[in-house]
Amino acid sequence: MVLNAEGSVLLLIDLQQRLMPAIHDSEVVIARAARLAEAARLLGVPIRATQQYPAGLGATVPELAGYPAETLDKTSFSATGNPGFAALLPPGADQILIAGAEAHVCVLQTVLALLPAGRRVAVVADAVGSRDPADRQVALDRARQHGAEIVTSEMVLFEWLGDARNPKFREVQKLLR
């Protein structure tokens, strides 16, 4: 699947203040998720987020807190298992791009629930993390085995742009420096 900005939604899963310090390479995960969110904002891609038990894990990290138009607080590990999830996704968004934590828990369970429901899912490998890198890698492998695309944030940006003549090309390109 080639990603396109018009049919995408960026879903930020559980990138929370008290969870991220425990995530391996959390600074990279947050930076790549922020790159995606800023590109999504520039290109008009809807941004949504989830927060797993915010009373315990805190709110979305400050680097990303201003981006989502809507945030769903949840307790189910799969975002799809929470009331209100279906309404969280904008109509017409047939490509769901996922960034977040933990890759082997909430990210993977959400992916595994979305795929059989006919959703086209891409997991952004450099924008997902787990406490243990081995868990992250196995989660990416398993998501791929079940039909998810595994992409990088830079792949997403260039596919969303589609062409160097895109009026937002220079602004998005600056995010890669």
Residues covered by each model-derived region:
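Active-site-adjacent betaalpha module
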Residues: 2-9, 42-43, 55-177
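A short alpha/beta connector and helix-capping loop motif
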Residues: 5-8, 23-54
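Residue(s) in the substrate-gating loop at a strand-loop-helix junction
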Residues: 14
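Short acidic, Gly/Ser-rich segments with clustered Asp/Glu that frequently serve as metal-coordination loops
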Residues: 17-21
